[in-house]
Amino acid sequence: MTGDWMSKITHSGLKSWIEEVIALVSPKDVRLCDGSEAEYQQLCQQMQEAGVMTLLNPELHPNCFLVRSSPDDVARVEQFTFICTKTKEEAGPTNNWRDPQEMRAELHELFQGCMQGRTLYIVPFCMGPLHSPFSLVGIEITDSPYVVCSMKIMTRMGASVLEMLGSSGTFYKCLHSVGKPLAPGEKDVAWPCNPGHMRIVHFQDDSSVMSFGSGYGGNALLGKKCVALRLASYLGHKQGWLAEHMLVIGVTNPEGRKKYFAAAFPSACGKTNLAMLMPKLPGWKVECIGDDIAWIRPGDDGRLYAVNPEFGFFGVAIGTSEKTNPNALATCHSDSIFTNVALTSDGDVWWEGKTATPPQGMIDWKGRNWTPGGEPAAHPNARFTAPLDHCPSLDPQWDSPQGVPLEAIIFGGRRTETIPLVYESLSWEHGVMMGAGMSSTTTAAIAGELGKLRHDPFAMLPFCGYNMAAYFEHWLSFAGKGLQLPRIFSVNWFRKDENGQFIWPGFSENLRVLEWIFRRTDGEDSIARRTPIGYLPTEEGLNTTGLNLSRDALQSLLAVDTQGWRAEVNNIREYCSIFGSDMPRQILEELSRIENELK
């Protein structure tokens, strides 16, 4: 097997990099992945035999598997995620920076011999539609068959990508290891990892990623957050486009007119639910381009076009149910991998929120018999990895090489007070300030940070690959290019009343907010009123027919809380101070304008 890959790779730069890596990590075997279904099944079979994967009941979930990770490798690890640029200033105050030379030396030591006793897999992948001029090719070298199978679902992967790369194409070097070499005769564990030495490192000078010690999704599937956001955002800054942590949907009204919207929410704030929304209002349709990442570029006609670079969903399982997201359950019905969920006695999967009553006789995510009233059966960051084309509401343009034209950009977060249900920016600059000022209650997708309110500008705090002040400036620069820019909105489904209950019903009823946004992009002025914080819906402008929502509740959702907003402005201004003199003045001017108008 070791020599087979040589004849199939015509790219001399790729060949020499692979040889370098093999010499460094000393694998027992080398395998070039072709992305075929036969290869996927063989690797899944191999993982079943090793006790890594459990085949689910094929009558309930055809061709689906359950994987349990180590309890200390369950989420992205921001404290061990580094951006290596020439200077610390280029990475900015929100990123962990290390000197590239020092970090390379440290990683060289960690990777030395780290694949002993393991197979090295070469995984060619493409972020974006094959043969789109905007797509990026990466090669991930990994010692994890779980990563190989997940990359087959999450990216366009295999022989077709090598063919596309040819003998001289540009590619991103992505090196990953679980960091647990095996001595001769040593028995492997089900989920090898090395929590004491985790490193997820991005080198912007040569567009490469090195990840060590973790097998978890965001740390190990290097095409996702690493290439498609952290490296791509840096590239976009240089080339005049945006790589964003955004869902993209097509919304069609009862007259048959369709518009595309992009929306940025922090992890576990409902991106996947909105991306797969099933409207209750008659005649409306919502279709999904993607639920997590959007690459946005100016088109020849002056509009901004969005592409989803991914090929699958890596969705949060907790809370996903027939009520909250039936399309997600349909998407992961077959050909999917579930990680850290519970296993039922009949070979099905379960997680908190899937049904009102937990089934009897389950095995929890740690592999133990589960008893009600104890620890959760599924980990809070349990995931499903499912193919994009299994989504029942997939948009026909999902694979378009040019992308889809955006008419609205939406920012949202999990805020229990102050922030209204929906409002629209007064200008592009004001909209950029709205994105820069985003904050949200944190979730289980980030290790060790559950339940705190934190600033998360554009939902990109963990994913922006350069100085965020320069990133804000980059967003602002689109106003000076003569483009037909989308309108910008803010939404907040998570307002609570004095009893701690959510005021807005959410989920499929969020279509009512999308309807207001749709009508605003049509230029309907009568449905909005201008306030210091932006255009808010009039009470009659928001369609609440058939909702059990009192007038008082509606008014509180659409009110400008003067005191709360003064505190919000101060809070955003204080946060902006970490960027010092790099902070764009337009954002500070917008904050001052709001403050003055609130008086």
UniProtKB/Swiss-Prot annotation:
EC number: 4.1.1.32
Pathway: Carbohydrate biosynthesis; gluconeogenesis
Keywords attached to this entry: Cytoplasm, Decarboxylase, Gluconeogenesis, GTP-binding, Lyase, Manganese, Metal-binding, Nucleotide-binding
UniProt keyword GTP-binding present: yes
Location, primary (coarse class): cytoplasm
Annotated compartments: Cytoplasm
Cofactor, how bound (note): Binds 1 Mn(2+) ion per subunit.
Reactions accelerated catalytically: oxaloacetate + GTP = phosphoenolpyruvate + GDP + CO2
Annotated catalytic residues: C269
Any one GO CC term of the record: cytosol
Domain of life the protein comes from: Bacteria
Positions that bind GTP: A268, C269, G270, K271, T272, N273, R383, R414, F507, S508, E509, N510
This protein's record includes keyword Lyase: yes
MF-aspect GO terms: GTP binding; manganese ion binding; phosphoenolpyruvate carboxykinase (GTP) activity
GO biological process, one term: response to lipid
Cofactor: Mn(2+)
PANTHER family: PHOSPHOENOLPYRUVATE CARBOXYKINASE, PHOSPHOENOLPYRUVATE CARBOXYKINASE [GTP]-RELATED
NCBIfam families noted in UniProt: PRK04210.1
Quaternary assembly: Monomer.
Family: Belongs to the phosphoenolpyruvate carboxykinase [GTP] family.
Role: Catalyzes the conversion of oxaloacetate (OAA) to phosphoenolpyruvate (PEP), the rate-limiting step in the metabolic pathway that produces glucose from lactate and other precursors derived from the citric acid cycle.
Protein name: Phosphoenolpyruvate carboxykinase [GTP]
Species for this entry: Chlamydia muridarum (strain MoPn / Nigg)
Lineage of the organism: Bacteria, Pseudomonadati, Chlamydiota, Chlamydiia, Chlamydiales
Gene: pckG
